[in-house]
């Protein structure tokens, strides 16, 4: 296996964030412009500008804050990762829509955002509050989950069962709202499930899966906890449609401290109901801030502290390692990696 660069493009301006999908790379510049590269033709165009004349108490969208860019089939979204603001734009229909979420605990919570296809149309998952995400049909610009409750399925039954054996000291109204902070969103290749890499008070990392069709149609929230850990991992990716790869440090204690390098990080494979299916040990690689993606049965991991690795759960081996290569984005639709270094964007493939 080897990495091969298939295209490069010089960029004018300072790149603040970059994303890729559906054969396009899109990036946010420090002046607020969002540009895109057609990886087939090499054409570069300005997609839209995040600048606006409206004044916000918090300053509005900040092009120089940590941000993320998402691309899917003619749609581009850009959000401040730990802020309130974002935008989604349609390349074909020439519109852009402002996004804004509630400010509660946003400094610790990645802006939930993701695209998927359903019934031939692109849909968007986006956060509105810490425990509330919506799903919209972008073709119709219609929010499909406008009537969805923030209460989980079976909440009343669990409340009654719990207080059969416990004193109800606080006398609060029930059922209570969903007690979960949605985080970074990942979507399965078939669009049937999405994963939230979020957290719950404790604070514990919690990777939770949802069926997209059920989330749209069910008035209550039905969740499946894939993984929970103590300050360990708020990242993961689908490996196929029915499993999730998660970086795990086995010896992290209840306070978020680990035993150093003696016990290495692992990348584990979990079913959507939380059953551990496989694990591969990765000595010498600190995966605390790793990014993960998967295609063709391989899981790719990269980060500034260790470079790049490809893991095959079928053989239980690291099948490729490069300490110098560190992508800035990944096109899951085509299996392309995107680098952004020294004013040049590169498109790479693994062969």
Predicted regions and their residues:
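Flexible "stalk/tail and boundary" regions
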Residues: 12-17, 24, 33-38, 76-79, ...
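Short beta-strand elements that form the blades of beta-propeller/WD-repeat-like
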Residues: 23-30, 67-81, 86-87, 120-128, ...
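Blade-level signature of beta-propeller repeat domains, shared across WD40, Kelch, NHL, RCC1
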Residues: 329-351
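Short, solvent-exposed linear motifs at loop/edge-of-secondary-structure regions
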Residues: 127-129, 163, 169, 173-216, ...
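Surface-exposed loop/turn elements that mediate protein-protein interactions on large endomembrane-trafficking
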Residues: 1-10, 32-58, 80-107, 134-173, ...
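Long, hydrophobic, well-ordered secondary-structure blocks that form the structural core
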Residues: 110-115, 121-135, 141, 145
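Beta-propeller domains
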Residues: 198-207, 228-277, 287
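Repeated scaffold domains used in trafficking and secretory/extracellular systems
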Residues: 10-20, 53-73, 104-117, 180-185, ...
């Amino acid at each position: 296996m080897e990495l091969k660069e298939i295209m490069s493009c010089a960029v004018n301006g300072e790149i603040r964030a970059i994303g890729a999908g559906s054969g396009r790379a899109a990036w946010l510049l420090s002046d607020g412009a969002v540009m895109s590269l057609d990886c087939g033709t090499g054409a570069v165009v300005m997609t839209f500008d995040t600048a606006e004349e409206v004044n916000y108490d918090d300053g509005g969208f900040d092009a120089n804050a940590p941000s993320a860019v998402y691309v899917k089939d003619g749609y581009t979204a850009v959000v401040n990762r730990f802020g309130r603001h974002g935008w989604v734009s349609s390349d074909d229909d020439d519109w852009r829509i402002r996004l804004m979420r509630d400010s509660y605990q946003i400094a610790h919570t990645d802006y939930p955002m993701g695209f998927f296809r359903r019934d031939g149309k692109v849909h968007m998952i986006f956060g509105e509050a810490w425990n509330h995400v919506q799903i919209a049909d972008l073709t119709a610009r219609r929010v499909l989950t406008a009537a969805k409750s923030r209460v989980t399925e079976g909440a009343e039954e669990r409340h009654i069962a719990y207080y059969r054996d416990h004193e109800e000291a606080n006398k609060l109204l029930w059922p209570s709202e969903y007690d979960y902070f949605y985080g970074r969103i990942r979507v399965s290749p078939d669009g049937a499930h999405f994963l939230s890499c979020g957290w719950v008070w404790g604070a514990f990392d919690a990777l939770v899966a949802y069926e997209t069709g059920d989330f749209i149609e069910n008035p209550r929230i039905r969740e499946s906890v894939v993984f929970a850990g103590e300050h360990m991992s708020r990242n993961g990716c689908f490996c196929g449609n029915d499993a999730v790869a998660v970086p795990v440090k086995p010896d992290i204690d209840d306070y978020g401290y680990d035993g150093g390098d003696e016990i290495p990080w692992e990348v584990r494979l979990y079913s959507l109901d939380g059953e551990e299916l496989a694990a591969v040990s990765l000595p010498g690689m600190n995966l605390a801030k790793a990014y993960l993606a998967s295609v063709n049965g391989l899981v790719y991991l990269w980060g500034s502290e260790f470079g790049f690795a490809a893991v095959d759960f079928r053989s239980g081996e690291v099948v490729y390692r490069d300490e110098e290569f560190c992508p800035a984005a990944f096109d899951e639709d085509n299996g392309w990696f995107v680098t952004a270094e020294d004013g040049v964007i590169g498109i790479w493939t693994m062969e």
